[in-house]
Regions:
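Structure-specific DNA junction-binding interface
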Residues: 1-94
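Catalytic DNA-binding helix-loop module of base-excision-repair DNA glycosylases/AP lyases
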Residues: 40-41, 118-163
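Short helix-capping/linker segments at secondary-structure and domain boundaries
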Residues: 43-53, 102-110, 150
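Flexible domain-boundary/linker segments
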Residues: 58, 112, 158-161
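Alpha-helical ds-nucleic-acid-binding substructure associated with the helix-hairpin-helix region
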Residues: 60-134
Length: 163
């Protein structure tokens, strides 16, 4: 069946060949706190049973933590462990450290994070700062691209030409 207006309705990213919708689309967050928590918890954890439910709980409980300053206000209450049901101090310290990097880099919103990741110079500075956080590996850095909605191909182009 052909629709007269096919050109006006391009395929969504999840409809493109080779794109796994469960990986690429469902892991994009419009919430700084969600990006930080997801990136922190993903190491050696099952995404669907461990990470995603906790990030969804965070977004539901702390909708105002969608900015770095909003997330900071919530972090300072000391309740993150309860909100995401995560008692381990190591991961909670990593959340704190990544938040500090975002603050030092002046990244307040997901749009600003996307802009930073899309600029070769700023991207390099951010990745270097994040890499200094314990347990943030190159894989975690690339995963932050995914979580913020920066496509893998755009991130690759920046790495090839800018880093």
């Amino acid at each position: 069946m052909t629709i007269d207006n096919d050109d006006a309705n391009p395929l969504a990213p999840a409809d493109l060949p080779g794109i796994d919708a469960t990986t690429e689309v469902s892991r994009v967050w419009g919430h700084i706190g969600a990006i930080i928590v997801d990136a922190t918890l993903q190491r050696r954890q099952n995404y669907h049973t461990t990470v995603k439910p906790r990030v969804v709980a965070l977004v539901a409980a702390w909708p105002d933590a969608d900015t770095t300053s909003g997330f900071r206000r919530r972090l300072d209450t000391g309740k993150l462990s309860d909100v995401i049901s995560w008692p381990s101090p190591g991961r909670l310290a990593q959340v704190e450290d990544i938040t500090c990097v975002f603050e030092r880099q002046g990244i307040e919103t997901v749009v600003e994070l996307q802009g930073t990741l899309g600029d070769p110079v700023k991207r390099s500075v951010l990745r270097e700062a994040l890499a200094s956080v314990r347990h943030v590996s190159p894989k975690t850095l690339d995963y932050i691209d995914t979580l913020s909605g920066v496509s893998a191909s755009a991130a690759f182009d920046v790495r090839e030409h800018g880093e």
